[in-house]
Amino acid sequence: INRQKWLKEVLQALPKGIRILDAGACELKNRKYCKHLKYVSQDFCQYQGEKEVGSDSLQLENWDISHIDIVSDITAIPEPDASFDAILCSEVLEHIPEPTHALDEFYRLLKPGGNLILTAPFSSLVHMAPYHYCTGFSKYWYEHHLEARGLSIKTLTANGNWFALMRQEISRLGGIERQRKNWSWPLAYLYGLIGWFYFYMRTDKRAEDLACFGWHCVAVKKE
């Protein structure tokens, strides 16, 4: 299931009026799904979309973080214990040097019975450099680290599978070779097109156990 569609369904299903923290909220992309909630955003507000760190990394321009409620390190958010009914952290864990420390902080901030909503890439190119530290968040990562912290997994579903991931990555080939000024970039586009069609024909096959875009998780803090 598409990540944004999944997030919309999960967030809009939360009870009206509860207090939710959007950790690593960036440009508040998911706030529109939380109009019925008491929404609080947090971000460290240090990434500005600069281009100076490696031209090959994926950078984002026109970065607007002017509407963040709490500016802090995600592992030390200045809020009392058990002060949120739900916490959202979407596509952020790869930008944290020690992502398990963020899980510790989320556990502290959640009320018993509260929901922790997580998404993170299983495989991603370097982006938002230099704040990109890890990838490869498998379902086993969630199962191990959440259960170890007293968080019970409610749902854990894959976004895409290996075939869909390969289709996405091979479609980048022509653009990357052209960016690198490789004389053979037209051939790279052709090769990428052939590969795209092959993997498109295979996307109905289940292969999320090999790889996928990422896992969608809802965990509950044990009472």
Language-model segments: what does each one mean?
Residues 1-18, 27-29:
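Conserved alpha-helix/loop element of class I SAM-dependent methyltransferases that forms part
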Residues 2-5, 22-23, 67-69, 199-201:
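Short gly/ser/thr-rich secondary-structure transition/capping motifs
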Residues 2-6, 24-25, 101, 137:
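Short, conserved clusters of charged catalytic residues that mark active-site
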Residues 6-12, 55-57, 86, 123-124, ...:
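A generic short-segment signal for beta-strand/edge and adjacent turn/coil regions
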Residues 10-22, 165-170:
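Short, charged, low-hydrophobicity "junction" segments
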Residues 18-128, 143, 217-221:
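Conserved SAM-binding loop
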Residues 61, 71, 97-105, 111, ...:
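S-adenosyl-L-methionine-dependent methyltransferase catalytic module, highlighting the catalytic core
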